[in-house]
């Protein structure tokens, strides 16, 4: 488990917007940024209560936060999200595009609706979040996009749709890093492996050799931890800490990179 040492408020005065921050990895990212003093915009689409609970949890750290509902698959909603964030806090310094969905489906069964649903959220939405971040961030800002270990992973069946949706984000990252350079904005992506969230609970068995639906979670954790030199699977805090580093001024020379977050796992 990630340690819980007290962290310095190294992001005091910064404002961060995190999409899909009401739960899972997004929540973990938001809390780590808040612990370092950043003010947070907690974006959510449907789960208002969990998002407000994150706002309340952030308040206990001494940082400020607001929850803003927006369906980021719709560009007008993305525009409104940024405008409301700016109206609330006055400026933006950090944008983390976290929202996503995962799918495992035999390729011959993938429908046009499946394709649109996955690419609209995992790919198209991330492009327009990054576009709006580029426009609205102050000079020296930070953009962090969400890829996945799956983007460059072979041997996982029925995963082409998801893997492709994340691979495109890695291309966005390298190109946006060039385009945003004149504003001294860095653009990076993170590519986590399995992280203990509700999405992990539903899908992690696919990554376990000989995994089956309904496998006990203890077996799944043990199976995946066996591939990791650190002997465990990730928790959202692990991902949040890396994003907190990328958000910090000290990370300025890290730009246009896709950072694999697997604890050294080899699968």
UniProtKB/Swiss-Prot annotation:
Gene3D superfamilies: NAD(P)-binding Rossmann-like Domain
Domain of life of the native organism: Eukaryota
InterPro entries: NAD(P)-bd_dom_sf, Sc_DH/Rdtase_CS, SDR_fam
Class in the EC hierarchy, top level: oxidoreductase
Entry annotated with the keyword Hydrolase: no
GO molecular function, one term: oxidoreductase activity
EC number: 1.1.-.-
Active-site residues, Swiss-Prot/TrEMBL: 147 (proton donor), 148 (proton donor), 162 (proton acceptor), 166 (lowers pka of active site tyr)
SMART domains: PKS_KR
Pfam families in the cross-refs: adh_short_C2
Protein's job: Hydroxynaphthalene reductase-like protein; part of the Pks2 gene cluster that mediates the formation of infectious structures (appressoria), enabling these fungi to kill insects faster. The product of the Pks2 gene cluster is different from the one of Pks1 and has still not been identified.
Similarity-based family: Belongs to the short-chain dehydrogenases/reductases (SDR) family.
Name of this chain's protein: Hydroxynaphthalene reductase-like protein Arp2
Source organism per UniProt: Metarhizium anisopliae (strain ARSEF 549)
Gene that encodes it: Arp2
């Amino acid at each position: 488990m990630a340690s819980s040492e007290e962290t310095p408020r190294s992001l005091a005065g910064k404002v961060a917007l995190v999409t899909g921050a009401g739960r899972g990895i997004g929540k973990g990212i938001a809390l780590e940024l808040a612990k370092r003093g950043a003010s947070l915009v907690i974006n959510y689409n449907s789960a208002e209560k969990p998002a407000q609970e994150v706002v309340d949890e952030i308040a206990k750290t001494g940082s400020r936060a607001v929850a803003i509902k927006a369906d980021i698959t719709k560009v007008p909603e993305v525009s409104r999200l940024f405008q409301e964030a700016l109206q609330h806090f006055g400026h933006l310094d950090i944008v983390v595009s976290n929202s996503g969905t995962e799918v495992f489906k035999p390729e011959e069964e993938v429908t046009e609706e499946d394709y649109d649903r996955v690419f609209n959220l995992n790919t198209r939405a991330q492009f327009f979040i990054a576009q709006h971040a580029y426009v609205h961030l102050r000079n020296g800002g930070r953009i962090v996009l969400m890829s996945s270990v799956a983007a460059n992973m072979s041997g996982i069946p029925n995963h082409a749709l998801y893997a492709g949706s994340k691979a495109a984000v890695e291309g966005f990252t390298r190109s946006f890093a060039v385009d945003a350079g004149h504003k001294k904005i860095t653009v990076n992506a993170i590519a986590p492996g399995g992280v203990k969230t509700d999405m992990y609970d539903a899908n992690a068995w696919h990554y376990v050799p000989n995994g089956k639906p309904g496998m006990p979670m203890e077996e799944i954790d043990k199976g995946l931890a066996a591939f990791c030199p650190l002997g465990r699977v990730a928790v959202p805090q692990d991902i949040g800490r890396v994003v907190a580093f990328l958000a910090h001024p000290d990370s300025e020379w890290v730009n246009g990179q896709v950072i694999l977050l697997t604890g050294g796992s080899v699968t």
